[in-house]
């Protein structure tokens, strides 16, 4: 099953079900119904009609946003004369596409570099305060609602620092937000340099081709015209009059959905090195869109290929192959997986700006996979609980000065273990927890820790030990970032995850100015809220609190599995 840029390898039975789904969509006019924003493409319940039909503004973005390219380029010329660095303050859909664009395209000569801040760990915030010349830094405050707790906490910290320096702080900020949001009002009151208003009918994870993605991209000198024109090719290939069987987006959506129906729901990405960050954006789109009502597709990203034997029957693979990259290792591994009978999609890219096509293709595919699964791919019904529980902890802190922390079940040196265990021995307790895993499950490592290469390396080792020992998919993410990406899947899927949470002491904490809390308090409350939310949803979860040398502790915990 092949097209010029996309090859699908699978059993005859799977390929037949995909073709049958495409024929059904043709018969039911699914393409026209998508463009007519017909909510019955996903749900028959009238109470969901507004939520569904009001979230399809992304369909015409590639053609629509080309009208704003010159305006954005003019603004980029203004910015590059005044600033050496850009720091984007945002979470989830507001931050993932900009991060992918910078890691993929880099910065053009003469343009500022981009840093995405999406960690509330005080060490992550301090790194910017200590290492950046704030007078040469432009801050992008990026939030659809304008009320994202993490984003606004970042804003207060940097606005306060600039105010204390004697500068006119508003000159160092721009906002990207929805019309009528509290952030739009704040930007007016604080006299931000500029505010970009995005269409409200585009959900956060579908917003890569709105100002949320395009403004940061143009400010680093990326060719947003090429990005949009490439995306427009898929838009035209998925329009009302499209022959569905010729649309790569519809075909990929049918493939994702049909595999999920036969319990193949773990999707591992192998990606040429030059575009290695792209699956981080896909991860949120797929996980948050499909992980609900006991269903879901689990993306597995940023891991090296393993032997064929370490993958379960629930696995399938997407291979992004960029022309002229060194793809030798991936080519060999993918051939072995195909020969072993695993479903595989190979997507061929000619250059980096083909990402524009792929962004739009995945939006179409994810929406249509939602149609197969009969879910609403545009809501996130289970996200609010963790926020509510976190806010309750924060309110308790503001009243008493103390967070309602749980008493550890086991303490071993500088490692505290939370949960209920038969054994009081840390090794036995951890192995007792992981032994609950059965075929079709996955592990999710959730690290409310500061970013560092050392910690990344240790978490990667833990992932590989778990994968190779249990032959199950293993995902990982930093908190609170993952709460805005895979958090919905964790609480909304069919209870297939086993969750390993890491937290740490708030060393060298930092107050959020005039808010009555610190970044250390905030990230601790967020970890506590997610722990409670997972438990309230009947999830299997273990939490390690680490003091001192984080890398050494994670390595020790990994050794407990040997």
Language model region names:
Residues 379, 384, 399, 403-405, ...:
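C-terminal amphipathic alpha-helical interaction region
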Residues 103-106, 130-134, 155-158, 189-191, ...:
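Short, solvent-exposed amphipathic alpha-helical segments in soluble enzyme
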Residues 88, 139-141, 175, 268-269, ...:
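Structural beta-sheet core signal
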Residues 74-242, 316, 320-325, 331-339, ...:
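Glycine-rich phosphate-binding loops that contact phosphosugars or nucleotide phosphates
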Residues 480-516:
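Conserved, well-ordered active-site substructure
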Residues 1-77, 324, 332, 346, ...:
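Extended, charge-enriched "interface" segments that sit outside catalytic cores
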Residues 161-316, 327, 361-473, 484:
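Active-site phosphate/pyrophosphate-binding segments
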């Amino acid at each position: 099953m092949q097209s010029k840029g996309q090859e699908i390898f699978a059993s005859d039975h799977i390929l037949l079900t995909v073709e049958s789904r495409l024929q059904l969509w043709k018969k039911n006019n699914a393409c026209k119904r998508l463009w007519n924003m017909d909510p019955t493409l996903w749900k028959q319940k009238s109470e969901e009609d507004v939520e569904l039909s009001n979230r399809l503004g992304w369909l015409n973005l590639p053609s629509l946003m080309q009208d704003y390219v010159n305006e954005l380029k003019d603004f980029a010329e203004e910015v590059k004369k005044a600033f050496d660095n850009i720091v984007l303050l945002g979470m989830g859909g507001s931050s993932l596409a900009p991060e992918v664009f910078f890691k993929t395209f880099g910065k053009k000569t003469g343009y500022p570099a981009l840093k995405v801040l999406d960690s509330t760990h005080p060490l992550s915030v301090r790194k910017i305060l200590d290492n950046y010349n704030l007078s040469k830094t432009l801050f992008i405050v990026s939030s659809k609602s304008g009320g994202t707790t993490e984003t606004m906490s970042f804003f207060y910290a940097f606005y306060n620092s600039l105010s204390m320096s004697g500068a006119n702080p508003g000159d160092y900020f721009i906002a990207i937000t929805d019309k009528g949001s509290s952030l739009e009002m704040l930007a007016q009151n604080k006299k931000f340099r500029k505010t970009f208003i995005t269409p409200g009918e585009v959900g956060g994870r579908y917003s890569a081709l709105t100002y949320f993605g395009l403004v940061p991209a143009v400010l680093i000198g990326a060719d947003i015209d090429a990005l949009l024109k490439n995306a427009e090719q898929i838009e035209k290939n998925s329009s009302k009059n499209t022959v569905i069987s010729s649309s790569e987006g519809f075909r990929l959506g049918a493939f994702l959905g049909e595999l999920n129906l036969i319990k193949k729901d773990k999707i591992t990405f192998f990606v040429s090195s030059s575009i290695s960050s792209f699956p981080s954006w896909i991860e949120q789109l797929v996980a948050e869109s499909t992980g609900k009502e006991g269903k879901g597709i689990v993306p597995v990203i940023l891991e090296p290929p393993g032997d064929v034997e370490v993958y379960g029957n629930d696995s399938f693979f997407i291979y992004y192959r960029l022309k002229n990259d060194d793809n030798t290792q991936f080519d060999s591994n993918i051939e072995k997986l195909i020969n072993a009978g695993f479903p595989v999609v190979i997507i061929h890219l000619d250059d980096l700006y083909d990402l524009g096509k792929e962004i739009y293709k995945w939006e179409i595919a994810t929406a249509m996979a939602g149609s197969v699964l009969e879910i609403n791919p545009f809501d996130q019904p289970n996200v609010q609980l963790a926020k509510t529980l976190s806010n309750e902890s924060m309110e308790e802190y503001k009243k008493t000065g103390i967070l309602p922390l749980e008493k550890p079940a086991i303490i071993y040196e500088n490692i505290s273990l939370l949960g209920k265990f038969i054994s009081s021995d840390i090794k036995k307790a951890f192995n007792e927890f992981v032994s609950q895993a059965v075929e079709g499950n996955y592990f999710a490592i959730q690290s409310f820790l500061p970013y560092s290469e050392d910690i990344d390396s240790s978490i990667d080792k833990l992932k590989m030990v778990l994968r190779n020992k249990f032959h199950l998919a293993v995902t990982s993410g930093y908190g609170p970032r993952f709460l805005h990406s895979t958090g919905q899947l964790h609480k909304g899927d069919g209870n297939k995850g086993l969750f390993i949470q890491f937290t740490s002491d708030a060393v060298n904490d930092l107050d959020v100015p005039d808010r009555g809390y610190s970044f250390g308090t905030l990230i601790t409350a967020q970890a506590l809220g997610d722990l409670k939310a997972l438990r309230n949803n009947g999830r299997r979860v273990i939490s390690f609190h680490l003091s001192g040398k984080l890398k050494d502790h994670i390595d020790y915990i990994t050794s407990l599995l040997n």
